[in-house]
């Protein structure tokens, strides 16, 4: 592994830790959030979820063409989760998923997701979501070292079927990836 890759890994982890530190400025806030959001999702889930990865897209403006020509953008895999809707109508989920990454190698990810949910139409089944996910992933090209992730989430859904997505930021020829999956609630 070359020095620039170590710098990139360190920078990524450092930025993630700073972000988490700002969100949870003190332990009481963190424990309250855990107690009110994550623990009930684990202890009393309303739904069991099936995750099916759908697409990975590398932003063409941020990559050399010869790189994107080699990348896998069909991330087949599967995931499972537990979820619930809170009293405000917001979605909370705990999940674990494994999919084929850009290099066609397995990448596991597990974490917690939250989305503020809107139902803008008269049909209450249609919903839009915007939120975040916090979790841990590991990649082949980083020797499967567990890496924390804090990423945005967005979704559009109808009833128990949701198309959910995130964007992984990055630098030139690294990151800048749109990743989306289908989530089926049972």
From Swiss-Prot:
Domain of life: Bacteria
Reactions catalysed, as given in the entry: a lipid A + a 1,2-diacyl-sn-glycero-3-phosphocholine = a hepta-acyl lipid A + a 2-acyl-sn-glycero-3-phosphocholine; a lipid IVA + a 1,2-diacyl-sn-glycero-3-phosphocholine = a lipid IVB + a 2-acyl-sn-glycero-3-phosphocholine; a lipid IIA + a 1,2-diacyl-sn-glycero-3-phosphocholine = a lipid IIB + a 2-acyl-sn-glycero-3-phosphocholine
CC annotations in GO: cell outer membrane
Signal peptide (from-to): 1-25
One Pfam family it belongs to: PagP
InterPro entries: LipidA_acyl_PagP (IPR009746), OMP/PagP_b-brl (IPR011250)
Any one GO MF annotation of this record: acyltransferase activity
UniProt keywords, alphabetically: Acyltransferase, Cell outer membrane, Membrane, Signal, Transferase
Record-listed E.C. numbers: 2.3.1.251
GO terms of biological process kind: lipid A biosynthetic process
Gene3D superfamilies recorded: 2.40.160.20
Main EC class the enzyme belongs to: transferase
UniProt site positions, description: Role in the phospholipid gating: 172
Entry annotated with the keyword rRNA processing: no
Annotated compartments: Cell outer membrane
Coiled-coil region: none
Entry keyword annotation includes Acyltransferase: yes
Active-site residues, Swiss-Prot/TrEMBL: 58, 101, 102
Site (Role in lipopolysaccharide recognition): 67
Family: Belongs to the lipid A palmitoyltransferase family.
Quaternary structure note: Homodimer.
Protein role: Transfers a fatty acid residue from the sn-1 position of a phospholipid to the N-linked hydroxyfatty acid chain on the proximal unit of lipid A or its precursors.
Protein name (Swiss-Prot/TrEMBL): Lipid A acyltransferase PagP
Organism name: Shigella boydii serotype 4 (strain Sb227)
